[in-house]
Regions:
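Short helix-to-loop capping/linker segments positioned immediately adjacent to catalytic or ligand/cofactor-binding
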Residues: 174-178, 192, 274-276, 294-295
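A short secondary-structure junction signal
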Residues: 161-163, 173-178, 216-219, 319
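Outer-membrane beta-barrel pore domains
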Residues: 47-48, 94, 200-210, 215-233, ...
Length: 430
């Protein structure tokens, strides 16, 4: 099957790859698809969705159909297991226009945000077991939300898209906000892509996500008050430290030095796997993807190289004596950032192998002293996958982590995963 994209065909193919326009089905005969994801894992990642031992991954049931010649609708539900419990989540529930003029398209409801390269793709299409550390930290693995999206694809030979999203923002909300904005997230993005000859294609994107509810409050005077309190009540302080301040902070922290659990999204009041661990006022993203397939034919062998960089600005609003200011805190950075680079090579129709390296630089709160400590992740991963068909994959992956402050995780992780798709399934995105 040839995957060659020429000129405007690249733009058309990019649109056809979206779930709203690919294999639309009908009201009397809707598309129904089921994705089964299971695994065994030795070890755990910080902010990861997969726990040690046997478990269910991103098991997905989706219904989609064209409502008429003007609208398309889709519902995607996800089953996941965490801490011995199984939860049912609604990941997508949206309608999208099919016939707006001038290359415009409108989507409304709950959907995956189009920030970056990976986020708007379903988890079962990933080449690795979990998303990179920067995705787990800043987007809660994959960011979906309630809102609207308007995008425009230019009628040009070079694929060019502009888009805007307005979203509720609850999964990206900072902890401790008293009166958050109802509409919290505004996102602008652009994508550019094309072909180089018959065998090469590429896509680049830029995104700016404004999060009105993203800045966590920091109290400057708390540090001095707490030191005074420590000096006067040494024994009480030692007792609190031993028990991890369970009552005050709502943590089940039996190991007071494991700061990696103290700033994750449980503290934000969100589901353990679907809220951002680190938030800020502005999130910037740049991504680039390159694909090679001999003669444009992806069936036998092809190479994909992708990379993204995230910059999270102004993670905190500092309060001193009741006055809130944006600015520098002597104990912590003014911004967090992270990136990854991956390469995946399919060397015959049934086998592929890949390497990925990524880093995250952030800060975690030491609750006993109200101090910020640098928190870093360096993650190296290698995988090999067997593809009996286009609808199934068995993947073996090794992950090595170099962690700073993220103590509640493992340095070496081995994961064996299966992922199969049943029923109708739309084309994958570029």
């Amino acid at each position: 099957m040839s995957m060659k994209l020429n000129g405007t065909a690249f733009a058309v193919a990019a649109l056809l790859a979206t779930p709203a326009l690919a294999n639309t089905g009908s009201l009397t005969n809707p598309n129904i698809s089921l994705v089964l994801d299971g695994y065994y894992q030795d070890g755990e990642r910080p902010m990861g969705e997969r726990e040690e031992g046997f478990g269910l991954g991103h098991t997905e049931l989706a219904f989609s159909a064209a409502v008429d010649d003007k609208l398309y609708g889709k519902l995607t539900t996800v089953l996941e297991s965490h801490d011995g419990e199984t939860e049912l989540l609604v990941e997508e529930a949206f309608i999208q226009t099919l016939a707006m003029p001038g290359g415009l398209s409108l989507r409304a409801g709950r959907f995956l945000s189009d920030i970056g390269y990976l986020n708007n793709q379903h988890m079962h299409t990933d080449a690795f077991v979990e998303r990179p550390a920067v995705y787990r930290a800043f987007l809660g693995n994959h960011y979906y939300d309630d809102g609207v999206r308007l995008n425009w694809v230019a009628p040009t030979d070079l694929y060019f898209e502009l888009g805007a999203e307005v979203l509720g923002g609850d999964p990206l909300m900072a902890e401790g906000l008293v009166d958050p904005e109802t509409v919290g997230v505004y996102h602008l993005y652009t994508k550019l892509g094309g072909d180089i000859g018959q065998s090469h294609s590429w896509q680049a994107s830029l995104s700016w996500l404004r999060n009105e509810n993203g800045m966590a409050a920091m109290h400057e005077h708390d540090d001095h008050d707490e030191h005074d309190h420590d000096e006067e009540h040494d024994e009480e302080h030692d007792h609190d430290e031993e028990h991890g301040h369970d009552e005050e902070h709502g943590h089940d922290d039996e190991h007071g030095d494991e700061h990696g659990d103290e700033h994750l999204h449980d503290d934000h009041g969100h589901d353990h796997s679907h809220g951002a661990a680190f938030t800020g006022r502005d999130l910037f993203n740049a991504s680039f993807v390159y694909k090679w397939a001999p003669g444009g034919n992806y069936k036998y062998n092809h190479l994909t190289i992708s990379g993204e960089y995230f910059y999270l600005d102004k993670p905190y609003a500092f309060e001193e004596h009741g006055h809130e200011e944006e600015g520098h805190h002597e104990d912590g950075p003014d911004y967090f950032d992270g990136w990854y680079l991956s390469g995946v090579y399919q060397f015959n129709p049934s086998w592929s192998a890949g390497l990925r390296y990524g880093e995250l630089s952030a800060a975690l709160m030491h609750e006993e002293h109200a101090h910020l400590h640098d928190a870093k992740i360096k993650e190296s991963e290698a995988m090999i996958a067997w593809h009996p068909s286009h609808f199934s994959v068995v993947r073996l992956q090794y992950t090595h982590q170099d962690l700073t402050e993220f103590a509640a995780a493992d340095d070496h992780i081995i994961t064996l995963q299966y992922n199969v798709t049943l029923g109708a399934h739309g084309a994958h995105q570029f």
